[in-house]
UniProtKB/Swiss-Prot annotation:
Protein name: Large ribosomal subunit protein bL17
MF terms (GO), sorted A to Z: structural constituent of ribosome
Database matches in Gene3D superfamilies: Ribosomal protein L17 (3.90.1030.10)
GO cellular component annotations of the record: cytosolic large ribosomal subunit
Biased composition (Low complexity): 150-170
Oligomeric form and interacting partners: Part of the 50S ribosomal subunit. Contacts protein L32.
Sorted UniProt keywords: Ribonucleoprotein, Ribosomal protein
Protein's UniProt keywords contain Metal-binding: no
Domain of life: Bacteria
Protein encoded by which gene: rplQ
Region feature (Disordered): 137-183
UniProt cross-references to PROSITE patterns, sorted A to Z: RIBOSOMAL_L17 (PS01167)
Ranges annotated as biased composition (Acidic residues): 138-149
Pfam families tied to this protein: Ribosomal_L17
Amino acid sequence: MPTPKKGPRLASSPAHERLMLANMATSLFQNGRITTTLPKAKRLRPLAERLITFAKRGDLHSRRRVMRVIRNKSVVHILFTQIAEQMEQREGGYTRIVKIAPRVGDAAPAAVIELVTEPVAKKAVVKEAEAAAKVAEEEAPAVEAEATEAAEAVEAVEAPVEETAAAEAEAPAEEAADAEKAE
């Protein structure tokens, strides 16, 4: 567990605070998200992230270290099998704290702490895609210029063929007209 902050504790004694954080961590892993006060959520986050890191290791020693905090074996099993697999690609930042409206009874600042289950957006892949898009944009004008040149060349080749075909069609007509005049 991280070094406690100086000043008043969340509960009346250090033992009570440890038990309260362990119970909140158990509830977080069972339900995926819990609603609590903001100071409790901020104190729970480092503990929960450390337990998830142990679960990702997956060895016996890590399981025993988690069992020191979370006494419920079924929750430990869920943590090591399901949650650790979900967080396999993530290198930290397993939890998210979202502030919500103050609590109705005493106006205490409330928050929701939840496990982050969205897949990790790979930055390297995004950078490679952006680089490929830039290269494609640079090559696109060159390809378009080549395509227009090729189209113009095809039109130039087709135009003389059409002109010669038209000239040949006119030539017999002219010869026929000359022959009629001669007769």
